[in-house]
Amino acid sequence: CIRDRYKVLSTVFANITPIKNLTIRTQFGADYSHSTAFMQSYPSYVINNGMGSAGRNSSDVLTLSETTTANYRWELNESHSLNFLLGQEAVNFESTGFQVVSRGQANDKLTNVTSGTRASAWGDSNSSYSYLSFFFRGEYNYKDLYYAEMAARTDASSRFGKDHRWGVFWSLGFMWNIKNESFLKDVEWLTSAQIALSTGTSGNSEIPNYDHLALVAGGPNYNDEAGIYPKQPGNEDLGWEQTWANNVG
């Protein structure tokens, strides 16, 4: 079997600071991979009984992404520190591929796919999905003693029906850095002491790309004649799996 693979990754970004403490960043990314494979089995092999085979497949995968964020930092009297992040992200994934195997090659020097007498396996595929997200995060720090963080985001996935495409998720967190309190700051044997609390939700959309759609498929299904048959019923009520987690540490 002969395989060929190559992959191309690229990222382009730009940062601007329109006013003091505000940074706006836009980033575009592309991830492309291509692979091919060729296999052959010579007719001279004993187990082939004088009938060779050859196959070829090819696949292409492309992921495009775009992220834009606005980050604002603000400090007051070296005691209060605030950090706000507002952002948007879009991801688009596409993959295509095909394969074909033929049999009946009669000569070891003619074992390409077209030298076969019949195709024994074939197929092609095309799949895609996309995401669109908007998110916010706010952080507060008081004298490196008390920390608070809140975050919220909404995500849309093409894997779900139009009425369940969007999911909303959030989180809250608090932390007390006890080691920096005056009564512990000079205790040398204690290097770190913190109490943290957090709660929030997260989402999962890892299902096949078209499970929400009613699909039909075709092929030589009726006495080797072409036909169409129902492949899956679809379910427009599919939506985000949501998990709520609480942590104390």
Annotate each predicted stretch with a short phrase.
Residues R3-S41, M51-G249:
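Extracellular/periplasmic, surface-exposed regions of secreted and cell-surface proteins
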